[in-house]
Amino acid sequence: MAVVSLSEMMEAGAHFGHQTRRWNPKMSKYIYCARNGVHIIDLVKTALCMNNAYKWTRNAAKSGKRFLFVGTKKQASDVVAQEATRCGAAYVNQRWLGGMLTNWTTMKARIERLKDLERMESSGSIAMRPKKEAAVLRRELERLQKYLGGLKGMRRLPDVVVLVDQRRESNAVLEARKLDISLVSMLDTNCDPDLCEVPIPCNDDAVRSVQLILGRLADAINEGRKGSNAERKN
């Protein structure tokens, strides 16, 4: 049985690519046709890729791999946070800060700073400071929560990055590839399938399309982790 049906993808608008002038020729094998100057993605091939992505992701989770979801565009931000949280993955959904992976030591220190500030806030320590100092600390806390809040549970570098919009998140792609971190990527018609291990050709701009694909990948991670836990109990 298919992980995602053709009708589900059609309803989500997963078949709509970009304008034909904004395409990457490497995506030609995933394109069905062009209509009114817009490329239409071959959803039969998307379904096959999605089956492969589900199995690959499930097996990675079963073997204990750690996941990071990345998607900072407005229409993906909430979905990224929601689905990553649902499957216990870390996430970046506001802005990719340079060095999030390649300068992990510094980034980890910033995450620890965030945790310290949260403890200070919850204990009332910040409220006891002079008004101006408290305001500075709260601004710092707010900024760190915005950009690093999704990474608080990430103690080590991830093994897999799940990506929405390869072009927008090009810095994340470069850092992951530099560190040999696997990439599972939603690929619109302007993307490069050679830059990821697990391609999923689909519309990466429509909220419903992003929700559908990330939702299934989160399901795969949860299923894989349940299998891993069951094996340990036995």
Swiss-Prot record:
Keywords: Ribonucleoprotein, Ribosomal protein. The keyword Cytoplasm does not apply. It holds the Pfam family Ribosomal_S2. Gene3D superfamilies: Glucose-6-phosphate isomerase like protein, domain 1, Helix hairpin bin. GO terms for cellular component: cytosolic small ribosomal subunit. GO terms for molecular function: structural constituent of ribosome. One of its GO terms (biological process) is translation. InterPro entries: Ribosomal_uS2, Ribosomal_uS2_bac/mit/plastid, Ribosomal_uS2_CS, Ribosomal_uS2_flav_dom_sf. Belongs to the universal ribosomal protein uS2 family. This is Small ribosomal subunit protein uS2. The lineage of its organism: Bacteria, Bacillati, Cyanobacteriota, Cyanophyceae, Synechococcales.
